[in-house]
Amino acid sequence: MAETPRVLLLGDSIRMSYQPHVKLMLESKHEAVVTGPAENCQYSGYTRERLPKWLDELGRPDVVHWNNGLHDVGHNPNRSPMQFPLEAYLDNLKAVLGMLRKTGAKVIWATSTPVHPNRPFRSDAWAWKNEEIDRYNGAALELMREQHIPVNDLHAVVWSEVEACLAEDMLHLNKDGQKACADAVVEAVRKVME
């Protein structure tokens, strides 16, 4: 009997919120074993630094569904730089992609989800602008297309039902948003496993 495929999910708190749903959907039908770091993968530089440890702990994946972005594009007054430059973001994505490719896994890139258009932008707290999320998403999409990496557009999933998908903080996913993103992740994973 063939070994059950191993699916690795990488991403920030958005990933952490939909991962249990993805795990349930894929493992209940014995389609895959779903894993992901117990910690938040945060910004792209953090993922780049921690990925070897996570791969060592979690084992070689057959499929990787991955996102970095909101921690890079977000303005955080308690760090320097407050926002990671687009060039640094892309450099980190290239490095992470290179490490993932060395595992032999099929890689899926997921776009970063939007914030609610009414979420206030504050200079004294974490803050995001949708136009900046779009710019970082666009640059990442261009890179992934050049590298022939399939894309799961979670941004479009959430944006199409932004009122129904986002929690009260207008950033994180509520239960409906988690389910919508999990459905899209499962569909993308199944497609590359065909």
Language-model regions: role of each:
Residues 117-154:
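Substrate-gating cap/lid alpha-helix
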Residues 102-106, 149:
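A short helix->loop->beta-strand "cap" motif at the edges of active sites that frequently abuts
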Residues 111-114, 154-156:
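Short, well-ordered beta-to-alpha junction loops that form the rim of enzyme active sites
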Residues 89, 93, 133-137, 178:
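Aromatic/hydrophobic pocket-lining residues that form the small-molecule binding cavity
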Residues 72-76, 116-120, 159-164:
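Short acidic/His/Gly/Ser-rich catalytic and metal-binding motifs that mark active-site loops
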Residues 3, 47-54, 167-194:
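Histidine-centered active-site loop/cap adjacent to the catalytic His
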Residues 78-84, 123-129, 166-170:
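Short glycine-enriched, charge-decorated loop/helix-capping segments at active-site entrances
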Residues 1-95, 99:
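Conserved SGNH/GDSL esterase-like catalytic core that processes O-acyl groups on lipids
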